[in-house]
Regions:
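Conserved ATP-binding/catalytic motifs of P-loop helicase motor domains
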Residues: 1-207
Length: 207
C-alpha cells in the first residue's frame, strides 16, 4: 500500500484509504465526539467503528495478512497510520499493534513530507508531536527497527553523487556550484533546439 494513488500505482499496490476503507480527513486517536472545523471533518475511533464498511473478501485478506509493505512512507501522516492500526486491530480482533501484522516501511524522509492542512494541525497537535509517520502513537509506543540503505544504484559518477548528497542535506559547497555551472548554457536557444525537458516549480509555469 501507499499514501497516494500515484505511489500505489508505481508499487503495483493500492492506497491505504482504499485498502482499509478509511474516509478522507483527519483522525483523532481516541473515542471523543467527531469535530468539524471549517471544511475539515475529524474522525475518531468511535466514528470509524460505527460507520465501518468492508466486504468479506477484503476482510479475509486483512485477517490472513502476515506482512504489509507501506511505500513512500515520507508522505504518510501520523494520524492516518494510527487510523490504519485501529482498523487492522478491529478487523483481525487482535489488540497487538496493527493487529499482529508485521509492517515494512519503505521511503526516504528527505523526500515529500505529509500534507496536513493548518486547520487540521490546530487540532491534531494536541495528540501528536509532529506530522510524520514516526509520530504516530502506535510507533511512539512500539518503535520500529530502522535500517538505512546507503548504496546508490542509480548513479555511478562519484562527483555527481557528492553534489546530490550535499543538495539533499542542504550542505551545498562552492565546488558543487562550480560543478553544476559547467553544464549551464546561457546562450541556449529554445526555438532552435527540440527534445529538451524544461523543469519548473509549479504546474502553472509548466502550462
Amino acid at each position: 500500500v501507499a499514501p497516494t494513488g500515484i505511489a500505489a500505482l508505481n508499487a503495483n499496490g493500492v492506497t491505504i484509504h482504499s485498502m482499509f476503507q478509511l474516509p478522507f480527513g483527519a483522525f483523532i486517536p481516541d473515542h471523543s465526539d467527531p469535530q468539524f472545523f471549517e471544511s475539515t471533518k475529524f474522525e475518531t475511533k468511535s466514528t470509524l467503528k460505527r460507520h465501518f464498511k468492508m466486504n468479506g473478501v477484503k476482510k479475509a485478506v486483512i485477517r490472513n495478512m502476515e506482512l504489509l509493505i507501506i511505500d513512500e512512507v515520507s508522505m504518510l501522516r501520523a494520524d492516518l497510520l494510527d487510523a490504519m492500526d485501529f482498523m487492522m486491530q478491529t478487523v483481525r480482533k487482535n489488540s497487538f499493534p496493527f493487529g499482529g501484522v508485521q509492517i515494512l516501511f519503505i521511503g526516504d524522509l528527505l523526500q515529500l513530507p505529509p500534507v496536513v492542512k493548518d486547520e487540521e494541525w490546530r487540532i491534531l497537535r494536541n495528540h501528536y508531536r509532529g506530522k510524520f509517520f514516526f509520530h504516530a502513537q502506535v510507533l511512539v509506543q512500539f518503535p520500529p527497527l530502522y535500517i538505512e540503505l546507503s548504496h546508490i544504484y542509480r548513479q555511478t559518477d562519484e562527483r555527481f553523487i557528492s553534489v546530490l548528497n550535499h543538495l539533499r542535506n542542504n550542505q551545498i559547497t562552492n565546488q558543487d556550484i562550480a560543478t553544476l555551472n559547467q553544464f549551464v548554457k546561457p546562450d541556449f536557444d529554445l526555438r532552435a533546439n527540440k527534445g529538451f525537458i524544461c523543469l519548473t516549480t509549479h504546474n502553472a509555469k509548466a502550462d
